[in-house]
Amino acid sequence: MGRQVTPIYPRTNGTIQPVNFPIRNMEPPNHSLQSAGFQIPPPDAQFPRYHAAAPHHPRVEAAAPSCLDVARHVESCPICSRIHDTDKTLYVLVIVGLTILCFLLVKRILKL
């Protein structure tokens, strides 16, 4: 009963730290470059063959805008007002027209 079970997943609260993995050898073979007349420079110590680890920045959650803020923005912004166009007149006319057409087709089918 006193035995502790090791957790399967590390307790890092969902954050994943970057790891320096070596880059795969994706360079073309030297002989194909040399046969094409290219000079191959020696490896340079200035450019290491490892990825640099990105610094860890904690997430800063910004306050989400309220619905009123979004509505005011959509009204005042010319781009957003075109994207969020709320004029549904054309859709209503198309729906009414298709409903009348369906009604006439059903009426014609039932007469036969």
UniProtKB/Swiss-Prot annotation:
Domain of life: Viruses
Transmembrane segments: 89-106
Subcellular location(s) per record: Membrane
Keywords tagged on the record: Membrane, Transmembrane, Transmembrane helix
Chief localization: membrane
Membrane topology value: Single-pass membrane protein
Family label: Belongs to the IIV-6 466R family.
GO cellular component, one term: membrane
The protein, known as: Uncharacterized protein 112R
